[in-house]
């Protein structure tokens, strides 16, 4: 018997390089991991916080995206194991809230960076840093007018704690 009052569900590789190595495992981690943790939250009446992602918006046609935006997604693309996995995980969270009264929180993370970030994880910050350190040209995809939201890891943790301790239960 496990006694907990808060569950912090942060499991799932977030680096494209990592989640594309085993896309089936990535999707299973999002779905089954969330399902199992929500079951535990329901059994022990624990608050539940799930780390989701900005990737639930897919390739958004609206910038910046409000939480009410439903996105523009590709359910069968090479990134879909991560994007769709997080979308179904959010759906499960909201269904457990509606059907079982679970006390859930969903944090949609955008481009976190900080110490011990792997230099080859395939995300923009690490790519920029590695290229700059090698005195290489910085790779910009598109025409350079794109925008991204970045969050320092310590700020993200502070946000998680504030969200878990709040009464806010929407993404």
Predicted regions mapped to residue ranges:
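N-terminal Rossmann-like NAD(P)+-binding domain of SDR-like oxidoreductases, especially those catalyzing
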Residues: 1-112, 132, 142, 153-167
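Short, solvent-exposed loop/turn segments at secondary-structure boundaries
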Residues: 21-22, 116-121
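A glycine-biased structural micro-motif
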Residues: 170-171
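Activation segment of eukaryotic-like protein kinases
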Residues: 127-133
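Conserved loop-to-helix N-cap of the C-terminal "lid" that shapes the substrate pocket in Rossmann-like
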Residues: 106-109, 121-126, 137, 144, ...
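A general alpha-helical scaffold signature found inside nucleotide-binding enzyme cores
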Residues: 29-32, 123, 127
């Amino acid at each position: 018997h496990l006694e907990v009052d808060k569950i912090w569900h942060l499991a799932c590789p977030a680096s494209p390089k990592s989640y594309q190595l085993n896309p089936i495992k990535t999707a299973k981690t999002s779905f089954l991991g969330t399902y199992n943790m929500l079951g535990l939250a329901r059994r022990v009446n624990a608050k539940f916080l799930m780390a989701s992602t900005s990737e639930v918006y897919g390739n958004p046609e609206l910038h910046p995206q409000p939480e009410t935006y439903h996105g523009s997604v590709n359910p069968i693309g090479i990134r879909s194991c991560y994007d769709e996995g997080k979308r179904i995980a959010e759906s499960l969270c909201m269904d457990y809230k509606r059907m079982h009264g679970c006390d859930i929180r969903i944090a949609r993370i955008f481009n976190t960076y900080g110490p011990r970030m792997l230099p080859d994880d395939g995300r923009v910050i690490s790519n920029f840093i590695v290229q700059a350190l090698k005195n290489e040209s910085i790779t910009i995809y598109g025409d350079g007018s794109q925008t991204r939201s970045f969050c320092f890891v310590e700020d993200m943790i502070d946000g998680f704690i504030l969200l878990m301790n709040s009464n806010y239960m929407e993404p």
